[in-house]
Amino acid sequence: MLLVIGLGNPGKEYQYTRHNVGFIAIEKIANQYNSSFSTKKKFNCEIAETISDGQKIIFIKPTTYMNLSGKSVISVKTYYNIYPAKIFVIHDDIDLDTGRIKFKTGGGNGGHNGLKSIDGVIGNNYNRIRIGVGRPQNNQDVADYVLNHFSKPEYETVMQAIDRITSNFGLILENKLEEFKNKIA
């Protein structure tokens, strides 16, 4: 069983912001598996489930807002008894150029409040799929930057990155994490 979490903020005003790249990616991946989201208030998230090659995949989008994502993650993790090694978090990363992707297991949170929240409830030994959204320019506040919408060229670049993640997601199901890491880079 895999738990795949896309980080973002609920609400139409945040839908296509840099901070919601995790939501955008997880919707595309879940759609690839013909799985659609429904709200589960007891888990504080939207959830979609599917089975692929005999393996259950649970996709979630926390509805707690970014800074409290751990609340949703711990409730789903506990209910389904999922080990951190089987948890994959997809999130924005300002330390990567727009559209660049990095995969890693464990490590620090890089100042990302969604990851801080998750680390606080399950530790940090889970998998991360980091999608670059670039750095703010001209002394722009980081919070303002990540809560702003992508420019059209940025959005196209990010969608190409998400397409690479989606088309190679099956490698995660086959536990070929190193190959996944190389194919998405």
UniProtKB/Swiss-Prot annotation:
Hydrolyzes ribosome-free peptidyl-tRNAs (with 1 or more amino acids incorporated), which drop off the ribosome during protein synthesis, or as a result of ribosome stalling. The record marks 92 as: Stabilizes the basic form of H active site to accept a proton. Monomer. One of its GO terms (biological process) is protein quality control for misfolded or incompletely synthesized proteins. TRNA binds at residues 14, 65, 67, 113. It is an enzyme of class 3 (hydrolase). The record marks 9 as: Discriminates between blocked and unblocked aminoacyl-tRNA. This is Peptidyl-tRNA hydrolase. The active site is at residue 19. The lineage of its organism: Bacteria, Pseudomonadati, Pseudomonadota, Alphaproteobacteria, Rickettsiales. Belongs to the PTH family.
